[in-house]
Amino acid sequence: MEIRIGSRKSSLAMWQTCYVEDKLKQSGITTSILPIDTRGDQVLNVAIAKIGSKGVFTEELEAKLADGDIDIAVHSAKDMPSVLPDGFELIAFTDREEPADVLVSHKKDLDISDSSRPVTIGTSSVRRQALLGRFYPHVRTVDIRGNVQTRVLKMKEGLCDAILMAYAGIHRMGMDDLIVHTFSPDTFIPPVGQGCIAVEASSRLAAEKKEAIRACINHPASETCLLAERAFLKRLEGGCSIPAFALARLNGDRLTLSGGLMSLDGKKFIFNTRAGAGSQATAIGTDLGNHVLENGGAALLAEIRKQQTT
């Protein structure tokens, strides 16, 4: 059996793809990798929320899936829209890395909690900007785009004092020595899917290949958590462009999902938790999404989208 894998070209994307490829090879499956440029990689002077596409990092890979040029596409789960286009599905999730956000800097004495010292932090994530506004209002933010190495270089050249990034990406790139602060995911809640790698396929992929891929790659506990988080985001009709957040944890068969929504400045904050059996992951996520919408979330979403279009 041969599996053709599509991937973005960045170093982190290729690391994730090689991780998936190694899992397949260990089971005797022949593989090949096709690197693909996406609009999210090409348009670096515009914030993700303003590019105007939910699939900014996925559309080009999905085109290759639809054409039959590749069998699967490897993504950061956090980049995946909450609703996939017709004809595509997520067939596997890897064992999740630590989902926390970290502060990365070449200035080892940087203390984000010290409000007496001006600090500029690079991030283009609306969620991270909102969380900084809520918990660290003294911090100034600046948009920063590009792959991990590009962002680190921009920081060292003076664009900012530090960068706010996912621990998973920094760790996978071997840059742990640049971490100066790790944010607690219980308060600085990550986006849906952070730390997990997702495998996407055409719905037409042969059942034999799909089953073989799942057997090699899928991590059931991570999948359960991602199903809950993605159901929550789907109910909000959200993606990377809104400051929504959610984190599910599985203890035995008991699933706990915490999540919510913020205003762009972080001042308005809607948050709640739901729990239940892991087998009810999707229902738990939908229930939390309904709660958020019914308790000010619908009006807040309308306000956010109005601000983003003006």
UniProtKB/Swiss-Prot annotation:
Modified residues (S-(dipyrrolylmethanemethyl)cysteine): C240
Pathway: Porphyrin-containing compound metabolism; protoporphyrin-IX biosynthesis; coproporphyrinogen-III from 5-aminolevulinate: step 2/4
UniProt xrefs under SUPFAM superfamilies: Periplasmic binding protein-like II (SSF53850), Porphobilinogen deaminase (hydroxymethylbilane synthase), C-terminal domain (SSF54782)
GO biological process: protoporphyrinogen IX biosynthetic process
GO cellular component: cytoplasm
Cofactor: dipyrromethane
UniProt keyword list: Porphyrin biosynthesis, Transferase
Remarks, miscellaneous: The porphobilinogen subunits are added to the dipyrromethane group.
Function recorded in the entry: Tetrapolymerization of the monopyrrole PBG into the hydroxymethylbilane pre-uroporphyrinogen in several discrete steps.
Protein name as catalogued: Porphobilinogen deaminase
Gene name tied to this protein: hemC
